[in-house]
A protein has these predicted regions:
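Glycine- and hydrophobic-rich flexible loops that cap the catalytic core of alpha/beta enzyme folds
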Residues: 1-212
Length: 212
């Protein structure tokens, strides 16, 4: 018999990240640290660009995202989720959104900019962040924000040697930026549209961690 406390469905990236006043994510205390390497990031971009160029009309399945709904906003009905599985990919896609909105700032159309900016957080007055951290005794929240802030100044990040960086979020943000700077994407808005409509996650929501 199926467990009614578990629900898994396919979601486009736009419905995972570009969710203003709808969905927010939190890395809970029991989660392991962010461990993706530059090699992981480069492989992800290799795969994404290859799929975009060769299999543009096909969906790109990006694995599972297992969540626990922990709060519902009484005013907006927005839900906050603990990320049980998938935090490595989720965090990296948010870093990628920051790299894209910074690197291609002058080339973005309105729709692309909205997708990218809403992936980082709400664009209303409160500007609630899409991803937060409930990691007591960890520097994860500070490290993640430092990586986002660092990309605001592309001149400062130029030539940055990521091998000397201890912050994994920052190291990978630099890796993503350096990779994309070397690539020629003919139509960046078309690529961003593909990212948000063709990248698919299997999102599973649970009522509590004990049933996972």
């Amino acid at each position: 018999m199926a467990n009614k406390s578990i629900n898994g469905d396919s979601y486009q990236l736009k419905d995972i990240l570009a969710t203003e006043l709808s969905a927010y994510y939190q890395i809970p205390t029991y989660q392991r640290p962010y461990q993706w390497t530059e090699e992981n990031c480069e492989k992800l971009l290799d795969d994404l660009l290859s799929s975009y160029e060769c299999y543009k009309e096909s969906d790109y399945f990006c694995g599972s995202l297992v969540l626990i709904a922990i709060d519902t906003d009484s005013k907006t009905n927005a839900k906050t989720y603990d990320v049980v599985d998938g935090q490595q990919r989720l965090s990296t896609f948010i870093l990628l959104a920051k790299v894209l909105v910074t690197l291609y700032d002058k080339d973005l159309n309105k729709t692309s900019r909205e997708f990218l900016e809403k992936s980082l957080g709400d664009t209303d007055e409160e500007k609630r962040k899409r991803l937060d951290f409930n990691t007591i005794g960890s520097n994860a929240k500070k490290d993640f924000q430092n990586a986002l802030d660092f990309l605001d100044d592309l001149n400062a990040s130029n030539g940055k040697d990521s091998t000397r960086v201890k912050n994994n979020y920052l190291k990978n943000a630099i890796c993503l930026k350096n990779y994309l700077e070397k690539k020629e994407i003919a139509d960046i808005n078309d690529f961003i549209k593909w990212l948000y409509f063709k990248i698919i996650f299997i999102k599973t929501t649970c009522s509590n961690i004990s049933i996972i």
